[in-house]
Amino acid sequence: MRSPSHSVLPASAARTLLVLALTAGVSTAVPAAQATAPEAPVATAAPAAPVAATPYMGWSSWSMQSSKYPGLNPDGDYSWLTEQKVLQQADAMAAKLKKYGYSYVNIDAGWWRDNTWKPEFDANGRQTADPVRFPRGMKPVADHIHAKGLKAGIYLPVGLEKEGYGDGKVPVWNAPGCTTADIVYGDLRTTNGWDSSYKIDFSRPCAQKYIDSQARLIADWGYDFLKIDGVGPGSFKSGDNHDNVADIAAWQKAIAATGRPIHLELSWSLDIGHIADWKKYSNGWRIDTDVECYCDTLVSWENSVDDRFADAAAWSRHGGPGGWNDLDSLDVGNGEMDGLTKAERQTYMTLWAIAKSPLFTGDDLTRLDAYGTSLLTNREVIAIDQSSTPPARPVTATGDRQVWAAKNADGSFTVALFNLGDAPAAVTADWAALGFSGRGSVRDLWNHKDLGSLKDKVTATLPAHGSRLFTVTPHGPAQATTGYEAEAAGNTLGGSASVADCGVCSGSRKVGDLYLGGSLRFNDVVVPKAGVYTVKVAYVSGDPRPAEVSVNGDAATTYTFPSTGDWGTAETVSIPLSLKAGANTITFDSGSGYAPDIDRIDVPKRA
């Protein structure tokens, strides 16, 4: 994430500072000395719906906790969070948003800490409610939320917090003979995104019992959602000490043992290389850093709403029932406090919906403006997020003008147009990029309007950072194309370029090593007449990479190819190329950088 141009810390730095107080003086912190009486466990009826069958919808406290918007945190940074304010948000959600599918009321960091960030732990090293923020404890809060027909969420950092360790003699609940010294490594190595916890050693039998005790407490309080934060690999950390896969596996096991369906969400900037673990053990994973700007508004376009466009594509294959790609909080409902233009607010929600991200807002639900309400309650857009359609991804090479799409179960397409530039621009979705030709009927989802049957494409002039969202239903045939393999003997390789095996590529081969002047030229690309052709490029790239593309030796245009997620996955994007009648050459050149590996191109048989 970029740092803002003004003197406000980026989210990662702000969260780091937030935890400095958390780690200060921990060598003398003894939970038994500061413990409050544990809240009596009382069984609460569990919700019956499957966990994470669709992306969850709701609200989270962190955006308002972290903002410096005037009057929002009058008693110091992160002071917004109190029982009264959470219950006000729950009441507002029940009144305004519940009927549209919003159901989770999630309490984020700080519920066990006072305004100076001093923590509260029970006699067994488990976080418990700060008596000023939550004077009745955490169970009555969940009870109130449930009484509104909603679900309650809570938050913990990964690992054993240093203050919870105490002197190492703190007993683990319901585990005779186990103390906090028996669940961590002997050298007290640290873990999580802030190194604020001791790493738990799950080769020790007492370790699972401690996680079991935490899960039991949360379940007995009646919570339906748990966010575990600072998880690695991710959270800007790597290496053995910050590998928390075993922690998440332990949490999944502990939650299952409670018998209560609890949604387990992971944060932040998770390593995509461990996606199999995140899918196996959790119901959602944050793909990026905090969306909040830690500034005088809740968010800003540059810090880091716009960054999601570069990052979401890599994860698009991974979201589905049971576990979803989390783009973070959706702060589009409060107008000035959000820090965005109306166009940016619509674009923000458009991306979240097509990416099948959870739709949870961090706005003040008691102060939603009319425009924000219209965004958050647009049933057609919500339906895209909640449908069985897979997450969308770019179907054009990326830049300021982007087209994202996903094919729906009924054969139609969800299509989003984005203008990420700073000036108005026309953006076009060609039917060829979707794989069909002729006509398609177009439905404008934001405006609830049918645009009729359009030939070959849909174009919209968008404001800066603007968007449109459509359902496109094909009425023409599949696009007829001629395929050209990158590894074909008639092509010309230059510089470092070489042919390599590729199990996910057509023909099981590709051209790679396109770096520092490496190039691939397709020879004898034949079309019947001159025109602009929407050429589909199949490629592999573990990160976003540019390529300089030229036709017949003319000046090159640089296109950026979105990440395919790893070097074992192939995807396609389309690029417009002006071809002459007859034979053409199409060259992919890495220039002075590194280009994606190329599998093949498919050229329409007509322009």
At which residue positions do the language-model features occur?
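Glycan-recognition surfaces
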Residues: 182-189, 201-203, 257-364
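Carbohydrate-binding surface patches
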Residues: 346, 352-355, 360-362, 397-436, ...
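Glycan-recognition and catalytic regions of carbohydrate-active enzymes
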Residues: 326, 356-421, 450, 499-508, ...
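Aromatic-lined carbohydrate-recognition surfaces of secreted/lumenal glycan-active proteins
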Residues: 150-165, 252-273
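Secretory targeting and sorting signals
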Residues: 2-40
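Extracytoplasmic
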Residues: 425, 434-442, 452, 456-607
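N-terminal module-boundary/linker segments of secreted carbohydrate-active enzymes
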Residues: 40-83, 266
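Aromatic-lined carbohydrate-binding/catalytic grooves of carbohydrate-active enzymes
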Residues: 64-73, 89-144, 148-238
